[in-house]
UniProtKB/Swiss-Prot annotation:
Origin: domain of life: Eukaryota
Name under which the protein is recorded: Falcipain-1
InterPro entries: Papain-like_cys_pep_sf, Pept_asp_AS, Pept_cys_AS, Pept_his_AS, Peptidase_C1A, Peptidase_C1A_C, Peptidase_C1A_papain-like, Prot_inhib_I29
Protein source organism: Plasmodium falciparum (isolate 3D7)
Gene behind the chain: FP1
Membrane topology listed for this record: Single-pass type II membrane protein
Parts of the chain on the Lumenal side: 57-569
Source lineage: Eukaryota, Sar, Alveolata, Apicomplexa, Aconoidasida
Modification(s) after translation: Contains disulfide bonds.
This protein's UniProt keywords: Disulfide bond, Glycoprotein, Hydrolase, Membrane, Protease, Signal-anchor, Thiol protease, Transmembrane, Transmembrane helix, Zymogen
CDD domains xrefs: Peptidase_C1A (cd02248)
Amino acid sequence: MVAIKEMKEFAFARPSLVETLNKKKKFLKKKEKRTFVLSIYAFITFIIFCIGILYFTNKSSAHNNNNNKNEHSLKKEEIELLRVLLEKYKKQKDGILNESSNEEDEEKYTLNSETYNNKNNVSNIKNDSIKSKKEEYINLERILLEKYKKFINENNEENRKELSNILHKLLEINKLILREEKDDKKVYLINDNYDEKGALEIGMNEEMKYKKEDPINNIKYASKFFKFMKEHNKVYKNIDEQMRKFEIFKINYISIKNHNKLNKNAMYKKKVNQFSDYSEEELKEYFKTLLHVPNHMIEKYSKPFENHLKDNILISEFYTNGKRNEKDIFSKVPEILDYREKGIVHEPKDQGLCGSCWAFASVGNIESVFAKKNKNILSFSEQEVVDCSKDNFGCDGGHPFYSFLYVLQNELCLGDEYKYKAKDDMFCLNYRCKRKVSLSSIGAVKENQLILALNEVGPLSVNVGVNNDFVAYSEGVYNGTCSEELNHSVLLVGYGQVEKTKLNYNNKIQTYNTKENSNQPDDNIIYYWIIKNSWSKKWGENGFMRLSRNKNGDNVFCGIGEEVFYPIL
């Protein structure tokens, strides 16, 4: 009986088959529902993702199209600067227009009197038509300026295209005004001879006055200034500093333009570069005077060039008792030497805002001498001598001699083991380097030994006097002005010559037929040095400069030859 009772209780306790199936069915329905919901969520997420991709793609495409269609597309900070410009020059422009109208009224009165008394009326009618065109341009300029100011004050993204269109119209009007003013250009004559210097100075002063006061030109130069800022990654603290830099840039830009246009005797051209927003005072601050090297240090650690190579045949032939004789050195050495063509000169590097030119000149010299000796060009560390050479002042200046002295006493790391930062580091990290190069001594060269030293040793570290004329160099043979003080170090990598009529401006390595030039009188030949700078490949002729010299290379132009050293491996 008990067993039967337990079996009944067990039977009642077990769930029926129907209940089990119902539970399973409910579970499956929940699972299907969850799967469906997840699928819906996934589908919605996919749709949102696709919409986002399309949106950003279209936005990017539209932005690129706008940039392609209009290279003068304005940004908010550009609009802000233009607003300040317009406000600043508003009164000046009104004054110019009033003066212009008064002058035109006086001229009209004079012309009317002349017309009444003069039989030749054709020229007067022509002058009246020119003035009426100029008045029309000025009135149109006023209207456009007012419209431009209206859009600038709104300062939103939607007006960018319209702002840019107006800017283009303003620039076109400005060109028309300048074209009309060419009819009134002056010719500067002294004793019936064209005075180029006078024309350059007077023309420069007149154009500077006009450009400085005319708001249309300031808008045009603002556009060029924005392009300059973008190309050279210029960032200023605030609008006041930006305006100050803009004024400096504008003056430098006009100076560059006038040099290229008016200075016909110059053998070189200028261009805008990373220094175009530097004032003369700022350049002096950046290019500090190089450290002085006392004579006792030179005597203690360096070897005179003639003593270093005293057994050399050329030394004995062209130097008597340590002094240069009168023999023509070019009877034994080539008239053109360019170590770039021999593959032992690295491409110019960029020292940045750090005053480390001395490090780049000396380390570049070690690289070239090492490559000349070992047939293998390596890159060594400028940053190491900036951080570790205690005789130098890091980014605050130095001298190639002290850089060589450091390597003589400590060796030098490879560049990839001690990378350049363009700033001083508190610690010297040369202990991390595995491979180093060492020097045995330092060579010293006199100004009348440069040609021979280049041929026998290789590239040389030299110092020059840099000013605002020098830094704006673009191409050609530089024969401009230089600073009296030596404030910059470069690497002398060769020399050359070219017939004046064949001097051309380009950024490629130039070679010339020396046999042709040898038949030319000296007055018809331009002699030059080839120097490697440390202001990047964008400066000068792919980072290099051709600098004027005399035939024997001993005229010390721009200071080349005063302090010359080289590493002895």
